[in-house]
Amino acid sequence: MGKAFSQLTSQKDEDKSILPDNPAMASKAANYFSTGNRKPSHSCVPCEKAASTSFVTCPTCQGNGEIPQELEKQLVALIPYGDQRLKPRRTKLSVFLAVTICLLIFSLTIFFLYPRNIVVHPVGLNSSTVAFDETHVQLNMTNVLNITNSNFYPVTVTQLTAEVLHQTSVVGQVTSSLRLHIGPLASKQMPYEVASRILDENTYKICTWPKIRVHHILVNIQGALTCSYLTHPQQLPFESFEYVDCRENMSMPHLELPRPA
């Protein structure tokens, strides 16, 4: 007898609604609960609107039903496991495309920004002027450098330093600031002038003695160019040996050399 009474009381407690005693909301929420083995034919049944209650669209009914706004934070929406919203579309394809694009951009950036050689090649002596006094030879030479930029970005030549050596003695020096721009994959020729003063007695005789037919002397030109690219400075050394006629002025114009392949 007591057992039957206990079961009856338990059944009454289960049938008791957990919602507030509002007739409009109770009738509204009744459509979203099932007891025992009862199975609704639809995931959400359209509900009748009450005049004094505001409603929000049921998230699982695809817009076909409504729930009381007061119960929006109390009711739980159930969606099938096979619902398309639980299966992100083309996730693998999107990730693959994103990774591929990032790798492609990274590879292209490395390819175009990777520093390549900047070649400085002395073309030779372009012209020279000679002057004498009683003890020394004043020799002014104009030389030409060919600069080749193998990078995919421009470079700027900012400084030139050079010195002239004759018989291991420094006879002339020059330092000058420049602003020579060289485009990507381009070559330019740059002339520069060095004034030299030779005090060697034997050299003076070679240059001034009229009985000597050949008045050439050998000078060694050493120098360096300072280039800047992508805010990075770089020094490029060069060296050349030139035979100079120290008896009279001469001019040997050099045409621009083609860029080496």
UniProtKB/Swiss-Prot annotation:
Keyword Membrane: yes
Domain of life: Eukaryota
Organism: Rattus norvegicus
GO CC annotations, alphabetized: plasma membrane
PANTHER family: TRANSMEMBRANE PROTEIN 106A, TRANSMEMBRANE PROTEIN 106B
Bilayer disposition of the protein: Single-pass membrane protein
Region spans: Disordered: 1-22
Stretches with biased composition (Polar residues): 1-10
Broad class of the protein's primary localization: membrane
InterPro entries hit by this protein: TMEM106 (IPR009790), TMEM106_C (IPR048509), TMEM106_N (IPR048511)
Protein family: Belongs to the TMEM106 family.
Protein name (record): Transmembrane protein 106A
